[in-house]
C-alpha cells in the first residue's frame, strides 16, 4: 500500500473492501483513514460502525484500529476488549492495496486464515 496519489487525507471516511480469492464479495468495513507511517496504513472503526458481507451485517461493539503493513500480506486489528470478544485479530491476506478503480478505498483478498487472541479464556488460536 504505497500509492501516495491514491491515499486519502487522514480523517477521511472510507470503506475497506475485502473480496474472496475467486473475486466474490466478502466483508466491507466502514472506517476512517487515520494516516500512514513506517509501519503501514492505519484505519479506525469507532464503536457502532457498520461492517457487512453477503448475508450478514453488524455494528461494531467496540472501537478498533487496523494496521496494513507495506507488504500487504495481512491486516492486524486491535479491538477495545471487552466489550469485543477478541483483543487481536490478524487477517492473512493477499494483495492488500489502494483500489485502482475507487480513489481512497483500500481493498484486498481475504485468505480466510486468521490468528485470533480472545479475552474470554480461549487464548490465541488460528481460525
Regions found by a protein language model. Name each.
Residues 1-63:
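Charge-rich, low-complexity N-terminal segments
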Residues 2, 12-14, 49, 60, ...:
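Residue-identity detector for threonine
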Residues 6, 23, 80, 103-105:
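Generic marker of residues within folded, mature protein domains
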Residues 24-26, 39-40, 71-73, 83-87, ...:
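Coil-to-beta-strand transition motifs
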Residues 26-30, 61-63, 72-75, 108-112:
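Short, surface-exposed coil-to-beta transition loops
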Residues 33-35, 68, 116-117:
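Well-ordered beta-strand positions
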Residues 41-82, 89-99:
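Catalytic core of tubulin tyrosine ligase-like
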Residues 85-127:
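Conserved, surface-exposed functional patches that form binding/active-site neighborhoods
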Amino acid at each position: 500500500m504505497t500509492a501516495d496519489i491514491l491515499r486519502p487525507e487522514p480523517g477521511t471516511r472510507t470503506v475497506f473492501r475485502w473480496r474472496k480469492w475467486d473475486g466474490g464479495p466478502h466483508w466491507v468495513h466502514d472506517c476512517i483513514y487515520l494516516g500512514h507511517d513506517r509501519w503501514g496504513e492505519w484505519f479506525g472503526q469507532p464503536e457502532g460502525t457498520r461492517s457487512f458481507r453477503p448475508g450478514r451485517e453488524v455494528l461494531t461493539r467496540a472501537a478498533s484500529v487496523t494496521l496494513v503493513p507495506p507488504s500487504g500480506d495481512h491486516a492486524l486489528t486491535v479491538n477495545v476488549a471487552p466489550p469485543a470478544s477478541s483483543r487481536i485479530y490478524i487477517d492473512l491476506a493477499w494483495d492488500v492495496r489502494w483500489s485502482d478503480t475507487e480513489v481512497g478505498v483500500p481493498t484486498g483478498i481475504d485468505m480466510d486464515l486468521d490468528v485470533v487472541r480472545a479475552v474470554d479464556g480461549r487464548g490465541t488460536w488460528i481460525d
